[in-house]
């Protein structure tokens, strides 16, 4: 039970203070991957749009 409570507190803390989540920096060893990490959240949206393009290609069967 304490694990669930602590997890809930962590989730609420992330919701209340999202700026620390969005503006977190990678460690210096991984700084070269910053451009890739910036684009990664957009990838699921591209798959969502691809589904519409695919359905349009097959005439929404």
Curated annotation (Swiss-Prot):
Top-rank taxon: Eukaryota
Ranges that cross the membrane: 32-52
Disulphide connectivity of cysteines: none
GO CC annotation terms, alphabetical: chloroplast thylakoid membrane; photosystem II reaction center
SUPFAM superfamilies recorded: Photosystem II reaction center protein K, PsbK (SSF161037)
BP-aspect Gene Ontology terms: photosynthesis
Subcellular location: Plastid, Chloroplast thylakoid membrane
Pfam families tied to this protein: PsbK
Alphabetized UniProt keyword annotations: Chloroplast, Membrane, Photosynthesis, Photosystem II, Plastid, Reaction center, Thylakoid, Transmembrane, Transmembrane helix
Function noted in UniProt: One of the components of the core complex of photosystem II (PSII). PSII is a light-driven water:plastoquinone oxidoreductase that uses light energy to abstract electrons from H(2)O, generating O(2) and a proton gradient subsequently used for ATP formation. It consists of a core antenna complex that captures photons, and an electron transfer chain that converts photonic excitation into a charge separation.
Classification via NCBIfam families: PRK02553.1
Summary of subunit composition and partner proteins: PSII is composed of 1 copy each of membrane proteins PsbA, PsbB, PsbC, PsbD, PsbE, PsbF, PsbH, PsbI, PsbJ, PsbK, PsbL, PsbM, PsbT, PsbX, PsbY, PsbZ, Psb30/Ycf12, at least 3 peripheral proteins of the oxygen-evolving complex and a large number of cofactors. It forms dimeric complexes.
Similarity comment: Belongs to the PsbK family.
The name this protein goes by in its record: Photosystem II reaction center protein K
Taxonomic classification: Eukaryota, Viridiplantae, Streptophyta, Embryophyta, Tracheophyta
